């Protein structure tokens, strides 16, 4: 049985997590701008691939941006049950919003469009996956 205190020993680096969050939030990705959403999908795909994920790009339909499916190899092999994480990385803010409302970091807090919904949660999910892989 795993040690209950092992989670406390994981090397979470707040600065690294916040740096990824700031990069992702700086990539404006309004829902109805397929090119902008695809740039965000490129960024997320790169980060996930660097963790060892197999990336499948699913073309958007009806003028919308693409989706990304990232699959990580299971230590028990193919067919073993896994973990499903779903998220969106588009925002409601139009291109140019960051000129008027820039993202910013103040200590351990970040502010701006996309920081919480939903890029922040997705960055944390990616970090959790990184920790699972490293464990």
Region annotations inferred by a language model:
Residues 2-115, 133-134:
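Acidic/His- and Gly-rich active-site-bordering loop/insert found
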Residues 118-135:
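Acidic/histidine-rich catalytic neighborhood of metal-dependent amide-processing enzymes
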């Amino acid at each position: 049985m795993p040690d209950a205190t092992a989670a406390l020993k994981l090397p979470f680096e707040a600065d690294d997590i916040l740096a990824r969050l700031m990069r992702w939030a700086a990539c404006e990705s309004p829902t109805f701008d397929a090119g902008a959403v695809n740039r965000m999908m490129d960024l997320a795909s790169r980060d996930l691939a660097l963790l060892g994920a197999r990336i499948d790009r699913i073309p958007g339909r009806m003028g919308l941006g693409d989706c990304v499916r990232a699959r990580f190899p299971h230590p028990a092999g193919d067919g073993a049950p896994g973990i499903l994480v779903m998220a969106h990385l588009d925002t409601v803010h139009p291109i140019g919003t960051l000129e008027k409302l820039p993202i910013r970091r103040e200590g351990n807090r970040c502010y701006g469009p996309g920081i919480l919904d939903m890029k922040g949660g997705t960055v944390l999910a990616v970090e959790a996956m990184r920790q699972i892989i490293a464990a």
